[in-house]
Swiss-Prot record:
Catalytic reaction list: L-homoserine + succinyl-CoA = O-succinyl-L-homoserine + CoA
Organism in which the protein naturally occurs: Burkholderia thailandensis (strain ATCC 700388 / DSM 13276 / CCUG 48851 / CIP 106301 / E264)
Pathway: Amino-acid biosynthesis; L-methionine biosynthesis via de novo pathway; O-succinyl-L-homoserine from L-homoserine: step 1/1
Domain AB hydrolase-1, chain residue ranges per copy: 45-360
Name of the protein in question: Homoserine O-succinyltransferase
Origin organism lineage: Bacteria, Pseudomonadati, Pseudomonadota, Betaproteobacteria, Burkholderiales
């Protein structure tokens, strides 16, 4: 299957203030967007793809100035791919608070003329959805054929079906959860603590000091990355292999430098992440994850929370995902069935843990492809 090829983002400016769930108000904000495919005359073939923690609007394709800049879901979105851009008009939106061009902590605060830094207001999944709805309005899209996402993106897809039930025909929720467990909140807290305790954090105003809390970001990413992989996958990739080429059991250095391949891998992932991601953004997005809990307003009753939804659903989980385990997806399915909603559920046997939603797995992709075939028939795409 061919790639979608060279793509380019564009920036959308919004003058109407956006009131956030916290009560703060953002005015004159911008969102970076990428689109793929063509919007049909009826504007009925639009699909919104929502991104996870460290991703962005760049869902598919490559940038002309960097042939290595492949979109984060390029194996899923493109001509002839499960989400076929020959049939659907796909939108990727970089969320508020991110560090890839949309208004966030790195943006200039018009009140001070300096970056917002830690002054940028806390945002929630619901805030992102309301901002995305304004993007849809700008395109003249009254109803999405589907809203789709994995992990945190799946939470946004679910929130869309709750907040805008008339505007979502299908919700595709992959490797997600209706709320974070105490363990997941704990992982996020440890990661945030690594950043907050970095001497280069400077209370979030490190931009003015010309530094970056790299050490904290590195540790935060290492913690997170462990939770994205399964134990079996890590055993297969690394086992107890030493970094030394001969792998000799007597090749220990007897110090605290890197000894094992898995240590080297985690440090590499941490360094790479610290190069391109922003610490304040990491704090914001992990807190948005913590706060997401649509059942909270219904005394913890998810069935009651989903009672007014109107979309049809595809919910998928992966057997070795322990970050957002299949049981969490089954909670969503049960709540939908309690309300007699149309829902398809698949629990995919895959060894790759939470990150499986990003990988090219034939069973997984065939499932998504078949579901989009159904949507295409409905909208005449």
């Amino acid at each position: 299957m061919e790639s979608i090829g060279v793509v380019a983002p564009h920036t959308m400016h919004f003058a109407e203030p956006l009131r956030l769930q916290s009560g703060s108000v953002l005015g004159n904000y911008q969102l970076v967007v990428e689109t793929y495919g063509e919007l049909n005359a009826a504007r009925s073939n639009a699909v919104l793809v929502c991104h996870a923690l460290n991703a962005s609007h760049h869902v598919a394709g490559v940038y002309a100035d960097d042939p290595r800049s492949t979109g984060w879901w390029d194996n899923m979105v493109g001509p002839g791919k499960p989400l076929d851009t020959n049939r659907f008009f796909v939108i990727g939106v970089n969320n508020l608070g991110s560090c890839f061009g949309s208004t966030g902590p790195m943006s200039i605060d018009p009140a001070t003329g300096t970056p917002y830094g830690a002054r940028f207001p806390v945002v929630t999944v619901e805030d992102w959805v309301h901002a995305q709805a304004r993007v849809a309005d700008a395109f003249g899209i009254e109803r999405f054929a589907a809203v789709m996402g994995g992990s945190l993106g799946g939470m946004q897809a679910l929130a869309w079906s709750l907040l805008y039930p008339e505007r979502v025909a299908h919700c595709i929720d992959i490797a997600s959860t209706p709320k974070l467990s105490a363990q997941n909140i704990a992982f996020n807290e440890v990661a945030r603590s690594a950043i907050l305790s970095d001497p280069d954090f400077h209370g979030g105003d490190y931009y003015a000091h010309g530094v970056k809390p790299r050490r904290g970001l590195r540790v935060a990413r290492m913690i997170g990355h462990i939770t994205y992989l399964s134990d079996d996958d890590m055993a297969e990739k690394f086992g107890r292999a030493l970094r030394r080429a001969d792998g000799a059991l007597d090749a220990y250095n007897f110090n605290f430098d890197v000894e094992f391949e898995v240590e080297s891998y985690l440090r590499y992932q941490g360094d790479k992440f610290a190069d391109y991601f922003d610490a304040n953004t990491y704090l914001l997005i992990t807190r948005a994850l913590d706060y997401f809990d649509p059942a909270k307003a219904f005394n913890g009753n998810l069935s009651a929370a989903l009672a007014h939804t109107k979309a049809k659903y595809l919910v998928a989980s992966f057997t070795t995902d322990w970050r957002f385990a299949p049981a969490r997806s089954r909670e969503i399915v049960k709540a939908l069935l309690d309300n007699r909603r149309s829902v398809s559920y698949a629990e995919i046997d895959a060894p790759h843990g939470h990150d499986a939603f990003l990988l090219d797995d034939a069973r997984y992709h065939n499932l998504v492809r078949a579901y989009y075939e159904r949507i295409a028939e409905e909208v005449g795409a």
